[in-house]
Regions:
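Cap/lid and interdomain-hinge subdomains that line or gate substrate/regulatory clefts
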Residues: 36-39, 95, 100-235
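Active-site loops and adjacent core secondary-structure elements that bind or stabilize anionic groups
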Residues: 12, 221-260
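Short catalytic helix/loop segments, enriched in acidic residues and glycine
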Residues: 14-31
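Periplasmic-binding protein-like
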Residues: 64-72, 92-94, 263-268
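Short, well-structured alpha-helical segments in soluble
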Residues: 51-64, 81-83, 251-260
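Single conserved hydrophobic/aromatic residue that forms the stacking wall/gate
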Residues: 2-9, 13
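Extended hydrophobic packing segments that form well-structured cores
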Residues: 367-490
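C-terminal catalytic subdomain
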Residues: 291-415
Length: 490
């Protein structure tokens, strides 16, 4: 939503100019094709009372994910203090002006007084700094594509911030025994992010799985067989289909339980399967594909992050996918370094490149039937891997730019979905920095979001974010961690 502020321009004519110009800008932004959501024009804000009223309307409007402000001319910033103090959603400060070029032949003091965003935006920016308030600043000309895309990118972050408070995670298992990094303070997570993380006995969900009708299971199995390649690999065809049907029942039962109880993310653990016949594999992959968050071995933080990142990418054209992921093993051959990413079963098929197959293989973890799972290799290109960790006195979001590649050779004996990437700036520095930061072996991974977007999300949440990218050096990174330990200390 666009908000505009006037300092009480000397005459109605000038105020009309300001309103007309802001309408033109809003209309152009909405027609640009570069914004994922609509910008709603609002009248010029002149008084303290109007500013407070408008910001509080934005607070209570469930369809409003944030506010965009622009100072057409000088705007005394004291008038903004109360409104900003009461405002609770993301804010973007667009530093632009209506005219692209100085009208050299006709410019006079009237024009200067009416078109001084260079003045007004500095005054406005100062009060944010004085109030120590987080905001995004985008500078440039409003008709330029790069500026419009920056606004569009921020919109997705704003949606992620606002929708975070609606994320509810269902845990059907506790944390894996003796594992540290997947632990965390769920109360602090609800304070910081708005996440509700609730536990259910696994057999309560098993009841929902067992209640799924055979007809519904058969229908979903037919969908699987139509959509995916079936790789029997010598297994009995009838038994194979029966195992696939178990996953269909798990998918339908879990989804109904999640929806009936208003959860958007789920956590499982192979050590606590109760009456489930198989470790949920294909079922969890399909739920992630539908937009649910997922975390394995009790990892509720990553489950919530996957959900948030899937919300942020909703409706994105040519999206390449977002998934739960785990670091497994390295290729350390010089010039071909990288990390093989996978999980026992649960990798989201939105990141798949090419055909997707169903396989069944024995799995020692869980001590259940051989589970059906989707198997594929992932897309190439730039992506990000993120890890949210609990340091005891604060959360830290670690964000790594990675370059996804194809493995040098196929891996015919590996019966799981995989990705392969090289962390920036390279495997050596990238992994050293990740370990120094305390990053987990689980990540929320996306081709469709940027480090900037996730850093902006963290800033809005008031938590530390550290970046590992092409410019990272270990000396600089260790200093940053040291400074942050002071800056973010409670």
């Amino acid at each position: 939503r666009d908000r505009l502020r006037s300092r009480g321009l000397g005459d109605v004519y000038k105020r009309q100019h300001v309103a007309e110009h802001s309408k033109i800008i809003v209309d152009a932004l909405n027609k640009s094709g570069n914004l994922p959501y609509e910008v709603v024009w609002k009248p010029t804000m002149i008084t303290n009372e109007v500013i407070r009223k408008t910001f509080n309307e934005a607070n209570t409007d469930e369809n409003c994910a944030g506010v965009i402000t622009w100072m057409h001319t000088f705007s005394p910033a004291k008038s903004w203090i109360l409104g900003l103090q009461e405002y609770r959603k993301p804010l973007l400060h667009l530093h632009t002006q209506f005219n692209r070029e100085i009208p050299y032949d006709t410019i006079d003091m009237d024009f200067m007084n009416e078109n001084q965003a260079a003045h007004g935006d500095r005054e406005y920016g100062h009060i944010f700094s004085r109030l120590n308030m987080e905001r995004k600043v985008v500078a440039g000309y409003w008709e330029d594509e790069d500026v419009q895309k920056q606004i569009g990118s921020w919109m997705r972050t704003a949606v992620g911030v606002v929708e975070s408070s609606h994320v509810r995670v269902m845990r059907v298992a506790d944390n894996m025994r003796n594992v540290a990094v997947t632990e965390g303070d769920k109360v602090e997570a609800q304070i910081k992010f708005g996440w509700e993380v609730d536990a259910y006995p696994v057999n309560e969900v098993v009841e929902a799985v067992n209640a799924v009708s055979q007809a519904d299971i058969d229908t979903l199995v037919e969908e699987y067989y139509d959509k995916y390649d079936i790789l029997l690999e010598g297994r009995d065809e009838k038994e194979f289909r029966e195992h696939v049907a178990v996953q269909a029942g798990i998918e339908l039962g879990f989804e109904r339980f999640l929806d009936e109880n208003n959860y958007q993310a789920v956590v499982t653990h192979f050590g606590d399967l109760g009456g489930l016949k198989q470790l949920p594999g294909l079922a969890m992959q399909r739920l992630m594909e539908k937009g649910y968050g997922f975390g394995a071995e009790g990892d509720w933080k990553t489950a919530a992050m996957v959900r948030v990142m899937k919300i942020m990418t909703q409706g994105m054209k040519d999206a390449k996918g977002t998934s739960f992921m785990e670091d497994y093993t390295y290729n350390l051959v010089s010039g071909k370094e990288g990390v093989l990413e996978a999980h026992m079963l649960e990798v989201c098929p939105t990141i798949a490149d090419g055909k997707i197959s169903i396989k069944e293989q024995p799995l020692s973890m869980g001590n259940r039937e051989d589970p059906a799972r989707l198997v594929f290799t992932s897309k190439t290109g730039p992506a990000i891997a993120t890890s949210l960790i609990d340091l005891g006195d604060r959360f830290r979001l670690i964000i790594n730019d990675v370059d996804c590649k194809k493995t040098e050779k196929p891996m015919p004996k590996l019966p799981v979905a995989t990705a392969f990437w090289t962390p920036q700036p390279n495997l050596k520095v990238g992994t050293e920095a990740w370990i120094l930061a305390g990053g987990a072996h689980h990540t929320a991974f996306s081709y469709d979001l940027t480090a900037e977007q996730m850093g902006d999300w963290a800033a809005c949440m008031g938590i530390e974010a550290v970046y590992i990218d092409k410019d990272t050096t270990i000396r600089q990174f260790k200093n940053e961690l040291l400074w942050n330990s002071v800056a973010y200390r409670k």
